[in-house]
Amino acid sequence: MKVILAKRAGFCFGVKRATQMAFEAAGKDQKTFTLGPIIHSPQVVNKLEEMGVGVVKDLSGVSNGTVIIRSHGVLASEMDEAHQKQLEVVDATCPFVKKAQEHVQYLSEAGYDVLVVGDADHPEVQGIVSYGKEKVYVVASGDQVKQLPKMGKMGVVAQTTQSFDNLKSVVTECLRRGGEVRVYNTICDATAVRQQEATELAQQVDCMIVIGGFNSANTRRLAEICTEIQPRTYHIETAAEIDCSWFQGVDTVGVTAGASTPKWIIDEVMNRLDQVNNSH
């Protein structure tokens, strides 16, 4: 049984940077927390907790120590609160997310009605929106733009993991309304590259394994894309979930992983697949 690992499986730049910053902070003596999970990987979160870095949902019960800002970013008000409490802040917000926050702040201050293309329930989007003063709308698609009230000049940014096609559909709808439309392409291509690679790999194999947190939106999307092409697709978080029966009649297995999946988990899965291979 041949096993093919996608070249870009695993950590993207922003996640790698955030986890490095978190593990470095964990080595210090003072009390340290992450505001929300540092990334959408329960295994990384657990590892940090073992090192004494807990997760807090908000800062209401925190009066001192170090707070690590997660890769998705946090609300502007939460960042202000951390500074007001004179906590040591380790800002591990992905630089691409930071740029989106800054663009919303600028557009809002410059009098634009702001559209954020993305998932309103995602913490990254909630953080980006919070940097606007008022008249900031979250839209998931071009169709939703049609339902918005009449606007003046419009500014558009996107959740970093959105597809370019979706951003384009929103911008097209904004242009139809007339008036000034200012667009910042804040999409990071790490998601698109992983999705394209997974699409190509799923076409070549008899079975796909997608590794990553069940709470990771980008990993779930990878699993959906692979399933559409190869129905024998399995989304797992760890090697322990692998079932030998999945590989009956299988000659080739493709493996990919979400942008928040650490290398050690990918390595464990590859080792487990070697064991399965050797037992046949």
From Swiss-Prot:
Record-annotated disulphide pairs: none
Binding residues for isopentenyl diphosphate: H40, H72, H122, S216, N218, S260
Cofactor(s) listed in the protein's UniProt record: [4Fe-4S] cluster
Keyword Ribosomal protein recorded: no
Keywords: 4Fe-4S, Iron, Iron-sulfur, Isoprene biosynthesis, Metal-binding, Oxidoreductase
GO MF assignments: 4 iron, 4 sulfur cluster binding; 4-hydroxy-3-methylbut-2-enyl diphosphate reductase activity; metal ion binding
Binding annotation for [4Fe-4S] cluster: C12, C94, C188
Keyword DNA damage: no
Function comment: Catalyzes the conversion of 1-hydroxy-2-methyl-2-(E)-butenyl 4-diphosphate (HMBPP) into a mixture of isopentenyl diphosphate (IPP) and dimethylallyl diphosphate (DMAPP). Acts in the terminal step of the DOXP/MEP pathway for isoprenoid precursor biosynthesis.
Protein family per UniProt: Belongs to the IspH family.
Protein name (database record): 4-hydroxy-3-methylbut-2-enyl diphosphate reductase
Organism of this sequence: Trichlorobacter lovleyi (strain ATCC BAA-1151 / DSM 17278 / SZ) (Geobacter lovleyi)
Gene symbol of the encoding locus: ispH
